[in-house]
Amino acid sequence: TSPATIETFGGTPPGTPEIRVISTAIGQPVPILQSVSHVPEGQKVGYSDAPPTSGEHWSRPASCGFYTENLPDERIVHNLEHGNIVVSYNFTNPAQVTGLRDALEDIELFDDWGVARPYDRIADGQVAIAAWGHLHTMNGVSPGELALIFEALAGVNGPERFTC
């Protein structure tokens, strides 16, 4: 593992050597914002990325699970700080929502480390998978790709590592 990988992932990635190699190629690293402190519940935060991958956030994270209603960025950033993975989706087709839910339900790590939510700040048909300081996007649902991302990144990033 190279020093850049260690810095990007906050330590040695888990899993097989193949997963460690794959984790360096998933998406792109995003610089951690300088301030990552708590702000009062309800206070809006201006993030440099949509969806955000770090920054100031509310003091209470979301429970793990699949949501069909909006979760504010300020809430899910706390999940990211805990090493959770946040899957943001923008689907107008209900079959795509069902396909994503089914794919995530098949990933054992999603129950303890994942939050999925609708998000209208990405293109229609897109999925954005965020971990602390890391962002991966894809068009549509790829169950195999989602499973690899969870295996490579769940519980790895974030200054605090707690399951939901």
Predicted segments with their positions:
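Surface-exposed, low-hydrophobicity interaction/linker segments
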Residues: 7-75
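Intrinsically disordered, low-complexity Ser/Thr/Pro-rich tracts
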Residues: 1-25, 151-164
